[in-house]
Amino acid sequence: MEGKEEDVRLGANKFTERQPIGTAAQSQDKDYKEPPPAPLFEPGELSSWSFYRAGIAEFVATFLFLYITILTVMGVVKSSTKCSTVGIQGIAWAFGGMIFALVYCTAGISGGHINPAVTFGLFLARKLSLTRALFYMVMQCLGAICGAGVVKGFQKGLYENNGGGANVVAPGYTKGDGLGAEIVGTFILVYTVFSATDAKRSARDSHVPILAPLPIGFAVFLVHLATIPITGTGINPARSLGAAIIYNKGHAWDDHWIFWVGPFIGAALAALYHQVVIRAIPFKSRS
C-alpha cells in the first residue's frame, strides 16, 4: 500500500484531492508542529475567567452525567423482568451516549474530560497543568455528588433499596478481577481519548475534532457492555465517588479503592503507551 493514492471527495463541494494512504500518508509533511508541553504549575490561570468557566463546565457535565446514568440504572434494577426495561445494553447506551453528548458540548470549553482518570492521563502527557488538573478533578467529584444526590431526592426509597448505583465487585469475582477490569477498561477509554484528540491527526484531517466525541462515547459504551457484570463499570472515579457518598452504606465502600486505583493505573498506562510507543515523543526530543 505504500505510496498508493486515491481520490477523496470533500463533502458536498465534490472537489477532489490526491491524498496518499498507507505509509505514504505518515511521511507526508503536513506543516504540523508538536504542541509544547503544559507547564507543571501555571499560577496565571487562577486569574483567568476561562479557567473557572472550564471548571464550571466540568461540574455541570459530570452532574448531568450522574443524573442520567444513575436514573437509568435505577430504572433497570427496579424491574421484575428484564424484558420490561432497557437492560444492560440500555445502561451501556446511557453511559456512552451521555459521554458523547457532553464531550461534544464541553470540548471547546474545558476539553470535555468529565472523568478524573481522563484528566490524570492528560496531565501525565503534559496536556494540562497540575493546577488545572486538580481543579478539574475537584469539580468533577462535586458534580458527581450533586448529580447522584438529585437522583436520590427524586426517588429515595428506590435509591436506597437498589444500591444507589454504587460500584461494587460482583459476587463470584475477586478484588483482583475487579481491579483488572477497571485497569483495562480505563486504558481503552483513555487511549481512545488520546487517539481521538491527537493534534497531529487533527492537523491532517479537518473533520477529526468534530467527530472526536463519537469514538470516546462508543468506547465507554463497549467497556460498559463488557464489565457491568464484574464491577458495574467504574472507569470514572468521580462517578464511583458520587454514588458511594450519596448511598453511603457499608458495602459501597468495601471495594471503593478499586475504582480509584484501577482507573488511575489504566490512565497512566494509556498515557505512557500513546506518548512513548505511538507518538514516540521521547525519541523525537533527542533527534
Curated annotation (Swiss-Prot):
Entry's localization field: Cell membrane
Biotechnology: Can be used to improve resistance to abiotic stresses such as cold, drought and salt.
One GO term (biological process): response to water deprivation
Motif (NPA 1): 115-117
Transmembrane segments: 56-76, 90-110, 134-154, 176-196, 210-230, 258-278
Region (Disordered), start-end ranges: 1-37
The entry's keywords: Cell membrane, Membrane, Stress response, Transmembrane, Transmembrane helix, Transport
Cytoplasmic-side segments: 1-55, 111-133, 197-209, 279-287
Stored Pfam families: MIP (PF00230)
Motif NPA 2: where in chain: 236-238
MF annotations from Gene Ontology: water channel activity
Tissue spec. comment: Barely detectable in roots, leaves and fruits.
Cellular component, GO annotation: plasma membrane
Function: Water channel required to facilitate the transport of water across cell membrane; mercury-insensitive. Contributes to the tolerance to multiple abiotic stresses including salt (NaCl), cold and water deprivation, by modulating cytosolic K(+)/Na(+) ratio, maintaining osmotic balance, and reducing membrane injury (e.g. oxidative injury).
Entry note about domains: Aquaporins contain two tandem repeats each containing three membrane-spanning domains and a pore-forming loop with the signature motif Asn-Pro-Ala (NPA).
Similarity section: Belongs to the MIP/aquaporin (TC 1.A.8) family. PIP (TC 1.A.8.11) subfamily.
Name of protein: Aquaporin PIP1-2
High-level lineage: Eukaryota, Viridiplantae, Streptophyta, Embryophyta, Tracheophyta
Name of encoding gene: PIP1-2
